[in-house]
Amino acid sequence: MSKAKKTAVTPTREENFPEWYQQVIKASDMAENSPVRGCMVIKPWGYGIWEAIQRDLDRRIKETGHENCYFPLFIPLSFLEKEAAHVEGFAKEMAVVTHHRLVAEDGKLVPSGKLEEPLVVRPTSETIIGDAFARWIQSYRDLPMLVNQWANVVRWEMRPRIFLRTAEFLWQEGHTAHATAEEAMDETLKMLEVYRVMAEEVLAMPVIVGEKPAHERFPGADKTYSIEAMMQDGKALQAGTSHFLGQHFSKAQNIRYQTAQGGEEFCYTTSWGVSTRLIGGVIMSHADDNGLRVPPRIAPKQIVFVPITRADGDEALIEDFLAPIVKDLSAQSFGGERLRVHVDRRPLAPPEKRWEWVKKGAPIICEVGPRDVAGGSVAMIRRDGELKGQITPKDELVSRAAAILEDIQKTLFTQAATALKERTVTVRTLDDFLAVFADDTTFGRKFVRARWCGDSDTLAKLDEYSITIRNVPFDQDGEAGTCVLSGRPATQEVIFAKSY
């Protein structure tokens, strides 16, 4: 019997994927649970990844004409009461503030000073931003109104999981107002495409782009679109959404404008957002049984040097050797930003430091000892490959660093894209459909592409098997066929999957 390969993370993905996910977060020192149930503490490595995502996406948002602003965390209950469908969708998740101070009674602090109107802690900002739009927009000359905010939101979560489902999470939410439905729809799809490009080119995470079915729409939206990614366990993760809100919110909040002809019309609005859930997607898309593998575009530190010192004088020798290398690398660019280079000078054993960076998923890890200095080289580990250092001349590292990082980025994307392609199957019969989902193992789960009639009475069968409809992909064949669930006529194909 062969001996099991030793891994830095236990259990492995195959043994217990949910627990493996938690252990990767712990091993990479990204985040931890907080004393507040359902909330997380994002540690520097995890927050550095979020900052890299922010920088890239913020640039894309601004390049499409949007400006950043900030709105209050607290929303008057009366604002939410104006939009019944919206409130119904979030009612069970809302945190509500009812008092404005604490007083000491019998040695304990108790709430006092009941508010005249309860305040809801922001679950999303359509209502309070809509209130501002109603003041800011008077004429067609004020349109389109294009704003974005980076903020935190709160939605009570019964089954929390770090990055994937937390009571408080970080996100960006874009909100826009337009004169016509066509302009608003163009905006909705434009920002969906921004998300697709960011997910694939920056996170190295391939996605399926499409429209959500009616029962999965954002509360109060006319249409919701999403990008859906496959995790390594074959489950789907909704990685971003963009909503065409029609005139529902503008009518509820009186967002009107005077037309060029002197008439008055309600605006058409949109909203769109992604959150720290993306980090969970990066983990489950790319990490392996030795820890995280961070796509270079979002790695807080892209090249890490680990000095190997054994005798007096080694430290100074290696420092002198690394100084010009670090200087030359730090002057280079990758992905539109300066290379992020780090020398780990902590007083820890070199193997301990090396394994820490392996578990964190730094794209390039270079060990440097006296023999490497003598040979003018480094022992380079690429986190997308074997963990044995390859002797690399220092001049080659300096000249090819950006190209190596780009190759790692492409490798991670290709691995994920290959898995998505190989584990997405098209079926035409209910028997085949159920046979695919009968395999509920980590590496056996698949996405199913099949026709669906759109009738709500078919959803009970999906609930029975814990299967969801992810979206209606944009790339449709348009051919007539039958619904895989009901046998009724159907032309649209949808993506069925187990999901997070």
Curated annotation (Swiss-Prot):
Pfam families: HGTP_anticodon, ProRS-C_1, tRNA-synt_2b. It is an enzyme of class 6 (ligase). One of its GO terms (molecular function) is ATP binding. Its EC number is 6.1.1.15. GO terms for cellular component: aminoacyl-tRNA synthetase multienzyme complex; cytoplasm. CDD domains: ProRS_core_arch_euk. It catalyses: tRNA(Pro) + L-proline + ATP = L-prolyl-tRNA(Pro) + AMP + diphosphate. Disulfide bonds: none annotated. SMART domains: ProRS-C_1 (SM00946). The keyword Ligase applies. It is found in: Cytoplasm. Keywords: Aminoacyl-tRNA synthetase, ATP-binding, Cytoplasm, Ligase, Nucleotide-binding, Protein biosynthesis. InterPro entries: aa-tRNA-synt_IIb (IPR002314), aa-tRNA-synth_II (IPR006195), aa-tRNA-synth_II/BPL/LPL (IPR045864), Anticodon-bd (IPR004154), Anticodon-bd_dom_sf (IPR036621), Pro-tRNA-ligase_IIa_arc-type (IPR004499), Pro-tRNA_ligase_II_C (IPR016061), Pro-tRNA_synth_II (IPR017449). SUPFAM superfamilies: C-terminal domain of ProRS, Class II aaRS ABD-related, Class II aaRS and biotin synthetases. The keyword ATP-binding applies. One of its GO terms (biological process) is prolyl-tRNA aminoacylation. Homodimer. Catalyzes the attachment of proline to tRNA(Pro) in a two-step reaction: proline is first activated by ATP to form Pro-AMP and then transferred to the acceptor end of tRNA(Pro). Consists of three domains: the N-terminal catalytic domain, the anticodon-binding domain and the C-terminal extension. PANTHER family: BIFUNCTIONAL GLUTAMATE_PROLINE--TRNA LIGASE, PROLYL-TRNA SYNTHETASE. Belongs to the class-II aminoacyl-tRNA synthetase family. ProS type 3 subfamily. This is Proline--tRNA ligase.
